[in-house]
Each structure stands twice: as structure tokens, then as C-alpha cells.
């Protein structure tokens, strides 16, 4: 399994084509419009798009996942993510968990109701949208 933020699509492709990875979990920080703000650093969005497209076009078994943060994610972001990744095989929402290792202080998790609302917004675009840790 390879965990990636998608910043190196050429490496991702080389690893997948060489059959060195059997599964890829790619972090999707936010909608493309808010990607850099959420990542907290400059991001080459073309590389992120290229990695996502490679996976969606059958490059490897994969899932996309977003760690949802109350202060950084809104409903319209979920719709934009859904439009961007429409038809993705699997998409997980993961609620933020605060810890001493978090790079930014003052962030908080969403309520269960907010997580369910985000899931409902994504389902029309990505039918296999799940909340990590949710039963059933």
C-alpha cells in the first residue's frame, strides 16, 4: 500500500506500472480552489490532478480520502470535490482528530451530522462515498 498526497505523479505511475504497489490511498486536501490554503504550503495542482486522473483511469487499485476539518471544509467544497472526482471508485471522509502532532493549532473535528451532510453532498458524484470508521 502506498499513501500519497499526489505530488509526484510520474513516480506514482512508475511504481504502479512496475507492480511495486498493490493499492494507493491518495489524500485529497480540499477542493482545488482551497487546496493550498488547506495544505498550508504551495501546491502544484496540475500534479495533483494528474495523479488523481492516473488512478481513476485504472493505473492502480485506489481510494481517495479527505481528512475533514471544521475550519477548512464547507459543503460547497464537497460538491466541488465530487465534481472533480466524479465516478471515483472509492472516497473516504475522515474526521479530523486533534493531537500534539498536528501542525496547526486551533483546528477541530466536525459533528457527526456535518459528516453525514458532507457524505450526502458527495454521493451523487461518487456513489461509494464512506465515512471512515462508520459501521454499516
Regions found by a protein language model. Name each.
Residues 1-112:
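Conserved AdoMet/S-adenosylmethionine-binding subsite of the radical SAM
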Amino acid at each position: 500500500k502506498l499513501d500519497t498526497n499526489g505530488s509526484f505523479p510520474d513516480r506514482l505511475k512508475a511504481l504502479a506500472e512496475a507492480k511495486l504497489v498493490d493499492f494507493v490511498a491518495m489524500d485529497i486536501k480540499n477542493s482545488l480552489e482551497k487546496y493550498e490554503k488547506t495544505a498550508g504550503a504551495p501546491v502544484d495542482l496540475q500534479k495533483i490532478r494528474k495523479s488523481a486522473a492516473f488512478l481513476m483511469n485504472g493505473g492502480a487499485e485506489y481510494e481517495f480520502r479527505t481528512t475533514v476539518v471544521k475550519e477548512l471544509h464547507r459543503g460547497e467544497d464537497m460538491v466541488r470535490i465530487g465534481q472533480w472526482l466524479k465516478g471515483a471508485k472509492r472516497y473516504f471522509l475522515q474526521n479530523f482528530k486533534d493531537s500534539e502532532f498536528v501542525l496547526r493549532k486551533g483546528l477541530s473535528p466536525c459533528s457527526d451530522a456535518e459528516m453525514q451532510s458532507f457524505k450526502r453532498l458527495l454521493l451523487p458524484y461518487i456513489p461509494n462515498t464512506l465515512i471512515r470508521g462508520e459501521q454499516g
